[in-house]
Amino acid sequence: MVNLSIFKQIKNNMKKIFAIAILGLAFNVKAQTIESSSHSTTGYVKSDGTIENSSHSTKGYIKSDGTIENSSHSTIGYIKSDGTIENSSHSTVGYVKKDGTIENSSHSTIGYVKDNGTVENSSHSTIGHAGNVKREWAAVVFFFFKFN
């Protein structure tokens, strides 16, 4: 005689393992790691624009309309559709070019965000890594606003 309770137990365990695997994938997709030049984790940018430090404390937000907020939801800047970065008073603080070049308000190159997520200063020295983070978001985090 076959003991059906064992099969039910195995089925329930498989469901739990599957659910854990799906949750793990969801967490991996939701947040991209921001790293220093030595690949130490300095923070995270979630797919919804939430900026977190390495301890997962929220430090800011990048909203879908381009508004940049601090952790208290006060507006500190804007990302315009043409790559212009503005402060809270709508003064231009810099530009993110389509090729990944980052410029200050005077159009001097201050850095680069490469296709592979490498972030470089104006001398092409690596200052960090932003993985699959949008270029504009990486520029905001590395060059234009401090989220400490």
Spans of features found by a protein language model:
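Sec/Tat signal peptide C-region and signal peptidase I cleavage site
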Residues: 27-31
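Short helix-onset patch at the extreme N-terminus, typifying the N->h transition
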Residues: 7-8, 20-21, 36
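Positively charged n-region of N-terminal signal peptides that target proteins for export
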Residues: 2-4, 8-17
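Sec-dependent N-terminal signal peptides
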Residues: 17-26
